[in-house]
A protein has these predicted regions:
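A generic structural signal for beta-strand entry/edge sites
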Residues: 76-78, 111, 149
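Acetyl-CoA-dependent GNAT
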Residues: 3-5, 9, 14-91, 97-106, ...
């Protein structure tokens, strides 16, 4: 399936829907594609997130296939972006931004935290453009690659 066949037409509204258990195998496959070498999330991790009641959404392309997903954990007065992922052929059209904004709406007035690889230039640009600031660095955060992560927050 090519990106042209599945890409959302410009100006088309982005509709998000809840993540259901039957979506988990697709997300595991996307994790393996998007985060190779960095311990992509397993089915068990997604099951655990759903069982804990954390907020997860998916987006489907024009053919009905999941091309994006995002999750948020809310605890007391803070929220943490657990993951944001967009299939490679769906990147660059605002889907990641729409999902991040949705998570921030769910977070409400809470401080929102996240971790992001220091070499993930596109994600860093997205987070900065949405008002996130870098708080610090976590050395060798991602395993097994040993890649570093920035800790970011909104508002700081």
């Amino acid at each position: 399936m090519t990106g042209e066949r599945t890409r959302r037409p410009a100006g088309t509204p982005i509709y998000l829907e809840p993540l259901y258990w039957w979506d988990i195998p697709v997300l595991v496959g996307l994790e393996e594609t998007l985060f190779p070498g960095d311990s992509p999330w397993s089915a068990e991790m997604f099951w655990s997130e759903l069982a804990a009641g954390h907020h997860y959404v998916v987006h489907r392309d024009t053919t009905g296939l999941i091309d994006g997903y995002a999750g948020l954990m809310v605890v007391a007065d803070e929220a943490e972006v657990q993951t944001v992922g967009v299939r490679p052929d769906g990147q660059g059209v605002g889907l990641g931004r729409a999902m991040l904004r949705h998570l921030m709406t769910v977070a409400g007035d809470r401080r929102v935290l996240l971790e992001v690889r220091t070499d993930n230039v596109n994600a860093l640009a997205l987070y900065a453009s949405e008002g996130f600031v870098t708080l610090g660095i976590r050395r060798r955060y991602y395993r097994p690659s040993g890649a570093d992560a920035y800790t970011m927050a909104y508002p700081q």
